Amino acid sequence: MKKSYRVKREKDFQAIFDGGKSTANRKFVIHFLEKEQDHYRVGISVGKRIGNAVTRNAVKRKIRHVIMEFSDHLKRDDFVVIARKGVENLDYQEVKQNLQHVLKLANLLEEGFESEKKH
């Protein structure tokens, strides 16, 4: 994921938290701020309650991969994905399903988007 697609600075995170809206499911919270820009920007937060650094980084990699997979269908807003306790035990498909669910709740995925389901 290119740097221009990331929310990195504290003031950007704070603007999203203060001026935006949020929605959640059991595994993720998404804070988002509607903004007119060329592309979406995403910040990922995985707290120390999730596990050690290796575990947290593995969770972040899964989230990043799912976001990149959905990238063509995401609205051009800023958003922050916060992982909740229990996400460290999910496999990639479960992370994908949960993220897709919460992105739809936040109305950040384009209308009519359905990812292919692998069984």
Swiss-Prot record:
Q: Does the keyword Nuclease apply?
A: yes
Q: Which Pfam families match?
A: Ribonuclease_P
SUPFAM superfamilies assigned to the protein according to its UniProt record, in alphabetical order: Ribosomal protein S5 domain 2-like (SSF54211)
Catalytic activities = Endonucleolytic cleavage of RNA, removing 5'-extranucleotides from tRNA precursor
Q: Which domain of life is it from?
A: Bacteria
Give this protein's Gene Ontology molecular function annotations: 3'-tRNA processing endoribonuclease activity; ribonuclease P activity; tRNA binding
One Gene Ontology cellular component annotation held by this UniProt entry: ribonuclease P complex
Enzyme Commission code? 3.1.26.5
What is a biological process (GO) this protein takes part in?
A: tRNA 5'-leader removal
Give UniProt keywords alphabetically. Endonuclease, Hydrolase, Nuclease, RNA-binding, tRNA processing
Keyword presence, Nucleotide-binding: no
State the oligomer form and interacting partners: Consists of a catalytic RNA component (M1 or rnpB) and a protein subunit.
In terms of NCBIfam families, this protein maps to: rnpA
Its family remark reads: Belongs to the RnpA family.
HAMAP family, sorted:
RNase_P
Please explain the role this protein plays, according to its UniProt record. Answer: RNaseP catalyzes the removal of the 5'-leader sequence from pre-tRNA to produce the mature 5'-terminus. It can also cleave other RNA substrates such as 4.5S RNA. The protein component plays an auxiliary but essential role in vivo by binding to the 5'-leader sequence and broadening the substrate specificity of the ribozyme.
Name of the protein described by the UniProt record = Ribonuclease P protein component
Native organism is Streptococcus uberis (strain ATCC BAA-854 / 0140J)
